[in-house]
Amino acid sequence: MALLLLCSQLGLNAVPALGVESALGILEIQLTDHREAIGDFSQVKLLIEKILLSPRSGLQFWRTGWQEIAPSSDSIDLTQLTGKKTARIFRGEIPPGAFDAFNIKIKTISAVLKKTRRSASIKNTVGPVKLAFEVPAQGETLLVIDLVVTDFSDHPPQGYELAIKGYELYTNGKLVEKIPPE
């Protein structure tokens, strides 16, 4: 009898655990281009290798390193993303949590100049960005990353460079942080 009571108690306690799977949050990452030297190009295609997130370890000091997520779109053309246009590179459910940084790993950049219709070299200077953000359970976090192609050709031997100009961070539709501020 005691065993039956114990088994039924364990069964009842296991039922709420089934709902834990739905406690995921949604993370969306978009790219846009800040209009500077992008007008020099007819095409600037980025091949995105992976997206990395750095979980905030807090008291769980063993939880260090980068969490890798695969981009949903691996190739984008920056010349199509001027103004308010964006390209979604990831949208998906992930376990809720706090993060300290993100990194967009770009595998290749292929560019074609408008004037000469020749390929041009663009140096990739995109690297890790320190940014504290959270993905809440059953909530939505949107990160819009503003990339910029800058022309340094008036300072030889430099040429064009790709970098992060800023970002906008939204949680559940509300703007949380914007760099640079307007």
Tell where the protein language model's regions lie, with residue ranges.
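A short, solvent-exposed, low-complexity linear motif enriched for acidic/polar residues
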Residues: 7-182
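Sec-dependent N-terminal signal peptides
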Residues: 1-5
